[in-house]
């Protein structure tokens, strides 16, 4: 199950959450899944951090990069309210022929809006929850895959995903990424039909290489 996600076959009909510190490979996994998904439909990619590199898509897709880019709809969201508009208003209109939706990163703009104002934070939490519910509805209605990436926050024992129980509840598959002596470790923390799995991998020019 975990290897399938890393190599571009995220499960349809559910939300897969991938979280970890910066530079651990979240966007690479999203790109690999996008390249694979264009074989069965459009890919809708919402980039909230400017991390999606066309050059990286060309590297991984190689000779097929033009076909990949022609079948990707890329949104750049610059604030949390724009992200909300894209997910709530625009996605439902264009997902009929889609095979994958990516939101990379779903919490970065949300965290920028958080403040000391309790009422504002309650509103932001509600907006985030409604976004994720909409994504799940689209996944189920259109039988497509949804991948959301997430930031981390430090805890006493290391780090945990941002967004708390809200994102944990709606994500039926959760993958944690860690750096491991120059390589990477992926941990399947949650899945409806699978127990915990661990896979070592490294990021290479053509994508990801699984380490046996």
Swiss-Prot record:
Residues given in the record as ATP binding sites: 20-27
Keyword terms, alphabetized: ATP-binding, DNA damage, DNA recombination, DNA-binding, Nucleotide-binding
SUPFAM superfamilies membership: P-loop containing nucleoside triphosphate hydrolases (SSF52540)
Superkingdom: Archaea
InterPro entries: AAA+_ATPase, DNA_recomb/repair_Rad51_C, DNA_repair_and_recomb_RadB, P-loop_NTPase, RecA_ATP-bd
GO molecular function, one term: ATP hydrolysis activity
Protein name as catalogued: DNA repair and recombination protein RadB
Organism encoding this protein: Methanocaldococcus jannaschii (strain ATCC 43067 / DSM 2661 / JAL-1 / JCM 10045 / NBRC 100440) (Methanococcus jannaschii)
